[in-house]
Structures are given as C-alpha cells and as structure tokens.
Amino acid sequence: GEAMSIGRTFEESLLKALRSTEYDPAAYWAEVGDDELETRYLSRPTPDRTYAVFEAFERGYDVETVAELTGIKEWYLERYKRVTDSMAAAAAGEFTAAATAGVTNAEIATAADAAVDDVETAVPGRTYKQVDTCAGEFAAQTPYYYSSRKPEFYPGPLTDDAAAGELRVDRDVESVVVVGGGPIRIGQGVEFDYCSVHA
C-alpha cells in the first residue's frame, strides 16, 4: 500500500504515514532472534522492514550496521533511531522528545506506563499549519492544513514562523470543520471534501 502524510519533521511524517496504513507487522519481535531479524526482515524489502528497523535500534544496533543490512541511507536511519531513542526517554518519564517525533500521547503513555491524561498535561497540544499549495505565488483558494505539535517544540527558524500559516479561527464568523470518518487514502482528494460539505 501507500500513504501520504505531512508533519514538521520527517519523524512525525513517517509515524503519521505508518499509522494511516492501519498495518500491523506480522512478526512478534520477541520471538524473532537477531539472525532472523537480519536475514528475513532487514535484508529483504517486505512490509515489515520499517518495523524491523525500529526493532533493530531497540536492540542496540547502530546506524551503520542497519544501513549495511538494509541499503537504506543513513540520514533516514538516523531519524528512525531518533524515534526509538525518544521512546526510551519516554519510558524513563521524559515525554517531550517522543511527542516531537510524532509519537501519540497514547503510545507515550504505554511506553511510560503512565496515564494518557498525565502525558497530555506534560506535553503541549497540537496546532494546525497551512500547506502553501501555491508556493507563495498567490493566495491559495483551497488551503490544506495538517496537525503538528505546538511550535515551542521546534527551536530555530520554525519557532514563530508566520509564513507557516497557523490556522486561526475568527470567532465572530460562523465556520464549520469537516472531520473525516476514517483514514484518507491516496487518490481521495478535494472532490470528497466537497461532497462532504454539500451532502
């Protein structure tokens, strides 16, 4: 299958895409030894390989070894490792890195053996950013938005980035938000949004 996602970081986008596939890896990693992990899951391009990469980092593999086994460029693998490292930090009670990486509050709570409510109060909520579909050439008539963690998580040029187009709602004007009933699939688009609001 395929998935498309948008986030402020590669990690966030990757995790959103993985969740949207609604795919559970076939392997029960506790039953898979290192040899099988390397020969069956890392060395072969299967739907489970992405999850096997996370498993390898959880087991302590380094980026260079995983790159050699998979043929995946180290830049990408470093981002996978950031997710794994952030989950280890979450298990120790530090939730910010995992939240920044795009891990859900429920997943963080599971890793930390904490209540979801405790995680939600410890990490800032989400904001909605506009995708500039016209690359600044002119105002977009059909703006798209994506959710992300609030900007205080992102140091540097992303903080207070007015060009990123944060969604603001004028409370004096009536408005409506259309929320889909399930994951959006590649091939669905504006025409389905149009049908939703005109149904």
Question: Where are each of the predicted segments found?
Answer:
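ATP-dependent carboxylate/acyl-activation modules
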Residues: G1-A199
